[in-house]
UniProtKB/Swiss-Prot annotation:
Gene name per UniProt: rpsS
SUPFAM superfamilies documented for this protein: Ribosomal protein S19
PROSITE patterns: RIBOSOMAL_S19
Domain of life, per lineage: Bacteria
Protein name per UniProt: Small ribosomal subunit protein uS19
HAMAP family assigned: Ribosomal_uS19
Record family assignment: Belongs to the universal ribosomal protein uS19 family.
Organism: Mycoplasma genitalium (strain ATCC 33530 / DSM 19775 / NCTC 10195 / G37)
Gene3D superfamilies attached to this UniProt entry: 30s Ribosomal Protein S19, Chain A
Cellular component terms per the entry's GO annotation: cytoplasm; small ribosomal subunit
Length: 87
């Protein structure tokens, strides 16, 4: 079930504040976040986020194609180990 259109997209306030500060300063160092649930806004484009996957932080560089998706979509939490060949 999708989010109600009258509510709008969700982003953590502290994350949006950090992005605005980084854009003003024109710095490009990674922004560390645990907020996988935040929606990527157009202001995020060009920034790098270190998104926590439950164990480590994975660097995610935001491009135009990612706008509207969640940060957690680009930081996988599960690693698939391939099945071994039949013996």
């Amino acid at each position: 079930m999708s989010r109600s259109s009258k509510k709008g997209a969700f982003v953590d306030a502290h994350l949006l504040k950090k992005v605005i500060e980084m854009n003003k300063q024109a710095k490009k160092k990674p922004i560390k976040t645990w907020s996988r649930r935040s929606t990527i806004f157009p202001e995020f484009v060009g920034n790098t986020f270190s998104v926590h996957n439950g164990k480590t932080f994975i660097n995610v560089y935001v491009t135009d194609d990612m706008v509207g998706h969640k940060l957690g979509e680009f930081s996988p939490t599960r690693n698939f180990k391939q099945h071994t060949a039949n013996r």
